[in-house]
């Protein structure tokens, strides 16, 4: 008898523990359901990186002193610094500087330890290429100003067409009652047609009212 009661007690305790664990898991799931969707319609929608995002490295040739600190602090000794010694001034003269982004791990050590701040991280993250050799950027390519996501010509016209309405595109920290930050192309076309039809209807109504007012005046 006591053995049966013990089994019932153990079963009840296990059932309560299982229900508690299930409730905790569902609480986490329901918490995520309150958040906005994370998936975006790339490349028509692009997430704006944070200020500390580590993207493509920007390089300023005029500030570089060829000290090779970036090479020493790099975990894989990636930067290639080509310089010669000027016998007259007894100083280094920089000839070329290159970084292969196909190998770079974007740790940011070169930017952090550069004594002249000639290296900086940008928000540019679209570095895909068909040829891996094209990812080896020289000082000219590294000196190119980065393309900002907010001023991307492929996104800006769609932003004006209400594809990306004003507001944050970040999924968290936004009022859940607000509509999704972005519409699909068919929704954009339908909204544009509705706006065009509404404006045409308003013009027709204004023209009818004008004719009516003229007739009453006569």
Curated annotation (Swiss-Prot):
EC class name: translocase
Cofactor: [4Fe-4S] cluster
EC number: 7.1.1.-
Molecular function GO labels: 4 iron, 4 sulfur cluster binding; iron ion binding; NADH dehydrogenase (ubiquinone) activity; quinone binding
Source taxon at top rank: Bacteria
Entry GO CC: plasma membrane-derived thylakoid membrane
GO biological process, one term: photosynthesis, light reaction
The reaction(s) this protein catalyses: a plastoquinone + NADH + (n+1) H(+)(in) = a plastoquinol + NAD(+) + n H(+)(out); a plastoquinone + NADPH + (n+1) H(+)(in) = a plastoquinol + NADP(+) + n H(+)(out)
HAMAP family the record matches: NDH1_NuoI
Functional description taken from the UniProt entry: NDH-1 shuttles electrons from an unknown electron donor, via FMN and iron-sulfur (Fe-S) centers, to quinones in the respiratory and/or the photosynthetic chain. The immediate electron acceptor for the enzyme in this species is believed to be plastoquinone. Couples the redox reaction to proton translocation, and thus conserves the redox energy in a proton gradient.
Family: Belongs to the complex I 23 kDa subunit family.
Protein name: NAD(P)H-quinone oxidoreductase subunit I
Species of the source: Synechococcus sp. (strain WH7803)
Name of the gene this protein is made from: ndhI
